[in-house]
């Protein structure tokens, strides 16, 4: 039986293979972070993980250094970002631009606190379409024409 690494030693990312359950679980989670409305759901449902006080009082915002749940989740997000941004792993992302942008933004304590605000989510949702790289080979002729008109 495999022993887990000591708590002070960072965990190694799972091998990038779709037959590895941990890899597919983390792929599904980071892929869901590309959806701003999922980020909003996390902020509303699990505010303690993001360092948000449920009362909504900005003066009482939890500090990551004092909340072990927020501290652990921030460390987990940093761990995920450290390897999903590499080409070896990013190739598996359906929406790499939006996913990696969300992971990068989630590294910031202020962003983790601010995503509970609807205006932040709406701005993030508005940038998703423009930020996604377009793969011309995957587009049909009609969609390309519509994109040209929008430009």
Curated annotation (Swiss-Prot):
Entry superkingdom = Eukaryota
Cite the entry's keywords alphabetically.
Activator, Nucleus, Transcription, Transcription regulation
Cellular component annotations (GO), alphabetically ordered: mediator complex
Annotated compartments = Nucleus
Which portions of the chain have biased composition (kind: Pro residues)?
Answer: 1-18
Report any one BP term from Gene Ontology.
regulation of DNA-templated transcription
Q: What segment(s) does the record annotate as region Disordered?
A: 1-20, 131-151
- Which Pfam families does the annotation name? Med31
**An MF annotation (GO) of this entry:** transcription coregulator activity
Q: Which PANTHER family match?
A: MEDIATOR OF RNA POLYMERASE II TRANSCRIPTION SUBUNIT 31
Describe the family membership recorded for this protein in Swiss-Prot or TrEMBL. Answer: Belongs to the Mediator complex subunit 31 family.
Sum up the protein's function in the record's words. Component of the Mediator complex, a coactivator involved in the regulated transcription of nearly all RNA polymerase II-dependent genes. Mediator functions as a bridge to convey information from gene-specific regulatory proteins to the basal RNA polymerase II transcription machinery. Mediator is recruited to promoters by direct interactions with regulatory proteins and serves as a scaffold for the assembly of a functional preinitiation complex with RNA polymerase II and the general transcription factors.
The subunit structure is: Component of the Mediator complex.
In Swiss-Prot or TrEMBL terms, this protein is called Mediator of RNA polymerase II transcription subunit 31
Q: What is the species of this protein?
A: Aspergillus niger (strain ATCC MYA-4892 / CBS 513.88 / FGSC A1513)
